[in-house]
């Protein structure tokens, strides 16, 4: 699959091979894409997608992740042919499919609402696509049986959708999408309608199924944890464009923009000034920070995740923040203002003189809180690890 600008001097015969996908929208203007025209509304809905240039490898699990309205579902619908882009091309297996109707594209799709046929049994729902393309009855029966076993519903084939739980219905929708052995599987927020425990269980099942079948998969989600747990690569989107593409570890540990850092997890953010080398000044205090390419003296935002802050017990009342040879040591005295128990950890709000009026939020493990006797009112010392203190240019 390959999406490219209509007027670009490119072909769809990508040298990377038929198993790759390439997605591109023109960068010279925003692209208005009609979503749905509903007679009752009498208006066109538009979603704008811009600067998209993405390649998807064969067998890869990709997540489009971003806030509501960022363009992730629009992009998925364009790939599916449910919305036709006004500019740009989409290629799959070296073939331009930009203007093909959905029925002629090689994909299976699973929606948030399951979209099962309520009047058909589970077996008939799964067999629907195979019957439409005229497969022999014996082949259909064998394929349906295979898929029911694969999704753990071998004994449920003669039931109707209303007789199944939400998680079971989503498995049926997944089996139906996979019945025709598509080259591409599209998942449009498939788990968002399920309760938390079922969602966690089913995301592992979907990932395991995808690995077994080796099908190239693109999933839309706004759930950061879901994307981190399931994806081989995450495409973080914002305001119709791509902010960053990378593995879950790269996205979480090495965000390229402040938006990505803040959207994937949580961050403490401080106005700061770039110092010499790998140092930054927050307030009037010098801290060692991660390597960066920002010019000395630039006004930036310094960010650190609550989970990266390390407690060290009783405060030592070190006012300067410098070690014996004058280097920033990133140890600061802090006062525990509030604590919130969240099961696996305590979310702790700290005040620190070196940070002036800015509160510092830290996540301490239950064991650390017990070992160091941390409680509201405690005077403690915490460390901001150098490699976890990231700098970002101001927007």
Swiss-Prot record:
Q: Which GO terms describe its molecular function?
A: ABC-type ferric iron transporter activity; ATP binding; ATP hydrolysis activity
InterPro entries on file: AAA+_ATPase, ABC_SmlMolc_Importer, ABC_transporter-like_ATP-bd, ABC_transporter-like_CS, AminoethylPonate_ABC_PhnT2, Mo/tungstate-bd_C_term_dom, P-loop_NTPase
Its record classes its membrane topology as: Peripheral membrane protein
SMART domains listed in its UniProt record: AAA (SM00382)
Q: Which UniProt keywords apply?
A: ATP-binding, Cell inner membrane, Cell membrane, Ion transport, Iron, Iron transport, Membrane, Nucleotide-binding, Plasmid, Translocase, Transport
Location of region: Disordered: 1-21
Identify the EC number(s). Answer: 7.2.2.7
ABC transporter domain location is: 23-264
Q: Which reactions appear under catalytic activity for this entry?
A: Fe(3+)(out) + ATP + H2O = Fe(3+)(in) + ADP + phosphate + H(+)
The main location class comes to membrane
State any GO CC term. plasma membrane
Compartments reported by the entry = Cell inner membrane
- Binding residues for ATP: 66-73
Question: Short name of one Pfam family for this protein?
Answer: ABC_tran
Q: Does the keyword Ion transport apply?
A: yes
Please state which protein family the record places this protein in.
Belongs to the ABC transporter superfamily. Fe(3+) ion importer (TC 3.A.1.10) family.
The free-text function statement in the UniProt record for this protein reads: Part of the ABC transporter complex FbpABC involved in Fe(3+) ions import. Responsible for energy coupling to the transport system.
Note the subunit structure. Answer: The complex is composed of two ATP-binding proteins (FbpC), two transmembrane proteins (FbpB) and a solute-binding protein (FbpA).
| Protein name from the UniProt record | Fe(3+) ions import ATP-binding protein FbpC 2
Q: Give the species this sequence originates from.
A: Rhizobium meliloti (strain 1021)
């Amino acid at each position: 699959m390959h999406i490219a600008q209509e007027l670009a001097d490119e072909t769809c015969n990508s040298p990377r091979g038929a198993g790759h996908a390439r997605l591109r929208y023109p960068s010279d203007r925003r692209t208005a894409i009609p979503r749905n025209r509903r007679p009752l509304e009498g208006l066109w809905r538009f979603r704008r997608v811009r600067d998209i240039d993405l390649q998807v490898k064969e067998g890869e699990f990709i997540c489009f992740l971003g806030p509501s309205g960022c363009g992730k579902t629009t992009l998925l619908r364009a790939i599916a042919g449910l919305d036709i882009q006004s500019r740009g091309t989409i290629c799959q297996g070296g073939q331009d499919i930009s203007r093909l109707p959905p029925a002629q594209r090689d994909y299976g799709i699973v929606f948030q609402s399951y979209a099962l046929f309520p009047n058909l049994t589970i077996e008939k729902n799964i067999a629907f696509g195979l019957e439409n393309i005229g497969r022999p009855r014996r082949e259909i029966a064998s394929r349906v049986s295979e898929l029911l076993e694969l999704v753990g519903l071998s004994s449920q084939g003669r039931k109707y959708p209303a007789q199944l739980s939400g998680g079971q219905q989503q498995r049926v929708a997944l089996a139906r999408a996979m019945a025709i052995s598509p080259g591409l599987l599209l998942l449009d927020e498939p788990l968002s309608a399920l309760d938390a425990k079922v969602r966690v269980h089913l995301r592992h099942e979907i990932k395991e199924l995808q690995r077994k079948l080796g099908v190239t998969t693109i999933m839309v989600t706004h759930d950061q944890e879901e994307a981190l747990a399931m994806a081989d690569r995450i495409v973080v989107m914002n305001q119709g464009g791509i902010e960053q593409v990378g593995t879950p570890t790269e996205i979480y540990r090495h965000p390229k923009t402040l938006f990505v850092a803040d959207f994937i997890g949580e961050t403490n953010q401080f106005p700061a000034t770039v110092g010499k080398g790998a140092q930054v000044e927050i307030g009037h205090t010098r801290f060692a920070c991660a390597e960066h390419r920002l010019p000395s003296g630039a006004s930036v935002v310094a960010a650190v995740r609550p989970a990266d802050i390390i407690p060290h017990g009783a405060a030592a009342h070190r006012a300067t923040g410098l070690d014996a040879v004058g280097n920033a040591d990133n140890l600061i005295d802090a006062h525990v203002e509030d604590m919130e128990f969240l099961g696996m950890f305590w979310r702790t709000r700290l005040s620190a003189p070196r940070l002036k009026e800015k509160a510092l939020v830290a996540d301490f493990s239950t064991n650390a809180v017990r070992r160091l006797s941390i409680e509201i009112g405690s005077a403690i010392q915490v460390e901001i690890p150098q490699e976890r203190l990231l700098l970002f240019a101001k927007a």
